Amino acid sequence: MNRFFRRSAAIVILVGAVVAVVASGATARSSAKLQVCVLLPDTKSSVRWVQFDAPDFAKALKAAGVTYSITNALGDAQKQVSQADQCLANGAKVAVLTSIDAGSSIAIQKKFAAAGGKSIDYDRQVVGGIAKVYVTFDGKAVGAAQASGVVSALKGKSKPVVAELWGGPTDQNAFWFKSGNDAVLNPLFSSGKLTKGPQKFVPDWLATNAAPIFTQMLLKTNNKIDGVIAANDNIAGAVIATLKAKHLKPIPLSGQDATPQGVQYILAGWQTMTVYKYVPDEAKAAAAAAVALLKGKKVPGVNGFRKNGSKQEPTVALPVVSITKANYKRLFTDKFLTKSQVCVGAYAKYCK
């Protein structure tokens, strides 16, 4: 079964049934005691959780020969707590957690610890949590790539106004990405080469929240925004929809996650770039960490630490790649996306 159809199956499992998917390695029975509990956050902040993370975790954990469950909380923090409770009742010893909010996530991690289990922060750091390791992409590099992409596209323009739409304020990742944005943009704002435009966090990373925020930004500036740092493709899509609704032209615009729609917008000239994070590597790294914790071994791949309250959290930080019109085909070569997902309908003419 190819990657596209595996993702479609994941959508049915995670969104249609909204139950834990308990699976096992090739030699284990499905009734075996649960070992690893993967807790994903939602289906709206990004398509990645359903289309990429869920099937990639299933593949990695099955290959590791451990029993596992994969659930999606659909943006409901209490649902995620209930899913974690069910995992514990089924014997799970390791939680791979993508946080919805810090309070509920800390509660989940404490419950696992009380039961003799361990936790992994996956993609989002739980500030104040007690995870043994944080598996993520290099957040500062993500933000720097976004800002650099927009700045490059603004070359030749005098003191362009750059607006920023950061991610959800309850997600520590949003602050990592912002720090990368700041590292590139702040010196240019200070020197007067760029003009600082409106800046806002987008609650829950939702396009439905980003659209009215960006609409207000345009009203505030009389439509004089020359470029936008959008934290991910979802938010970038809201910017594009707003520009189109106001009959405004495309402007330099960043994204993240290399979603099919994000790549389509890049090909059509509406989005400048997206940050490509090869999710199979992240899922594989988290699966390897989970297996190591199950066996009481050292977590492989730790290459640094991230401050978490008063402590330094061991971190597996993975590299990222900027995707533009010039190199989008890499996504097909890597089998991250298929041509049939991107080069279809009105966008087929842009693919060569």
Locate predicted features:
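A residue-level marker of the well-folded mature domains of exported/periplasmic proteins
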Residues: 3-7, 21, 26-352
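Bacterial N-terminal signal peptides
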Residues: 11-21
